[in-house]
Amino acid sequence: MEEVIVPEGKEQQEKYDGSSIQVLEGLEAVRKRPAMYIGDISLKGLHHLVYEVVDNSIDEALAGFCDEIAVHINEDNSITVQDNGRGIPVDMHPKEHKSALEVVMTVLHAGGKFNKDSYKVSGGLHGVGVSCVNALSTKMHVEVYRDGQIHSQDYEKGKPLAPVHVISEAEATGNWEQRKTGTFVQFWPDDTIFTETVYHWEILANRMRELAFLNAGIKIVLKDKRVVDAEGNCKRETFYSEKGLSEFVRYIDGTRTPLISEVIHLNTDKYGTPVEVAMIYNTDFNENVHSYVNNINTIEGGTHVAGFRAALTRVMKKYAEDSKMLEKAKLKDKDGNSTIDPNDFREGLTAVISVKVAEPQFEGQTKTKLGNSEVAGMVSSAVAEALQNYLEEHPDDAKKIVEKVILAAQARIAARNARQSVLRKSPLSGGGLPGKLADCVSKDAAECELFLVEGDSAGGTAKTGRDRVHQAILPLRGKILNVEKAMEHKVFESEEVRNIFTALGITFGTEEDPKALNLSKIRYHKVIIMADADVDGAHIATLIMTLFFRHMKEVIEQGHLYIACAPLYKCSKGNYSEYCWNDQQRFDFIQKYGAGDEKAIKTQRYKGLGEMSDEQLWETTMDPARRMLKQVTIENAAEADRIIAMLMGDDVAPRREFIEENATYANIDA
């Protein structure tokens, strides 16, 4: 696990040399078990390679020695990362007896971040560093501009081809015209290791944008040299944030209607660790808190989130009680005690929490939950002070927040009654399963699947075509409720929503939190959304995904949610047939079997799942051996939050703009 980088002061520059590099572990196992080091060997792991290299540059920036990072996707799908930091040390390592640059690039867990004289804290989740990237690349080229010279070395699959040597600017690959210090790294991912080797612009852009918000004042330039316009200019975007998290919250909340005039923003290290928090209230009903430790998105929260929530509840509750607004709203019991709930203070809240911790302890299912107990108090103290000051200085905003809290409390009481119906109808409490559910025979959740099927017609076909032992079917009547626009009690008043909860066996209440979602008795480990392959079907699938993202996010985070891919066409030539999932596959079939003549091919277009026979539905969409499933994951929670709010919320203008920008790439039924 890598630590985080926090400025130590310019006097530390003298200490950043070969003796700063400490060797903790060798590289041998990386190529044999790559998933252990980068998470997986598909799309996520592929992009993680870029993050590892960029993290080194971010570390330099946080230490105060770098303010610009360039990330390029090259024509050959290699990646280039260049910064204007101090440059990796190149002098002789005292123990390894080779250049410190070679040690950093070829030994796992070797780097300045393990020496507190060089960096106080540093980024990166897995903490494997550039040596792991080197090991998983067919080749890598590195250049370091330091002490007036450019030092270079090349590698193949992690092994150096020659010692570190000095080259001229004319021989260099990096752009050193404006920079006279820094590090340049270019690597080619190994296609014998990764199942996917094509980099996605949006994935990298989202992470670079996130890093720019989290580290104010750093300019990150992303270029895609694979995409060139008519003037010969490649695709390019610059990410820079002057105000950091304050702008991040505005970006996330872009399509929501703000409740208060300003972002509440604090940035301090006076309580023992650097804490930055930005928060704002909107008129929506959801809580959206995004937390980071050393630039790592802690999707499971942790002690920093607990400290934030404790301070928010304590300060807001005191203000609400002192203002006598709770009494007027009759939110006090017979003894005069407040019946307000901590959750009431978080409805309509969007916040980003970022802390820098020297030695973070991560725990939880995905190792993205902060466990350092001391951080809770530090964050709580910092947030309490800033929030108290804001409420005193902005009484009009304070009143609006308390009024919203009161509405949230009143809605919560209504929602509690609606939620109780979910508990009462849970199969675990003896209330029985939904009448429309065709359950499977097996009771082993790990091997059971639940298909959420659009419409009774397709539901009937799926019931007869399924594997009855392992596959259950729950037909849904038309478009389910858009939960993005609904208050919580309305969500649980919806019969379709209640049926999904009940069928899954999901209840509320854990040992830690009586209101938390409880997945301990989930009845299926695969929940598969099966909708028509047209625009209406995509809309229904999006509504269902929104329900899970807002009210059952743990189902997604634990890897249970999938989307079935139904074919659009069945193309036949004589007795030979193929299913086609898109127009390109249909075109290829026509070219191959009809010599390009569309009339020579019999094409059946499926406007809906109900048009297929049970046998066709089984062999194309439900058979585990032949079907295609897309797993729903949350790669970037803040960006997912923003996109869902934009697409499913009330504000039309941003949604129209998004559609216009992406219409070229859309598959539109017309």
Label every PLM stretch briefly.
Residues 32-51:
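Conserved short strand/loop->alpha-helix "switch" segment adjacent to the catalytic nucleotide/phosphoryl-transfer site
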Residues 1-20, 27, 49-51, 59-61, ...:
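GHKL-family ATPase ATP-binding module
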Residues 29-32, 36, 59, 63, ...:
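Conserved helix-loop functional segments at active or binding sites
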Residues 87-92, 96:
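A short glycine-centered beta->alpha linker in the GHKL/HATPase_c
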Residues 410, 414-429, 444-449, 460, ...:
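C-terminal interaction appendages of subunits in large macromolecular complexes
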Residues 94, 363-375, 579-585, 589-590:
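Helical (often loop-to-helix) elements that flank the catalytic cores of nucleotide-handling enzymes
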Residues 37-41, 112-123:
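Glycine-rich ATP-lid/hinge loop adjacent to the conserved G-boxes
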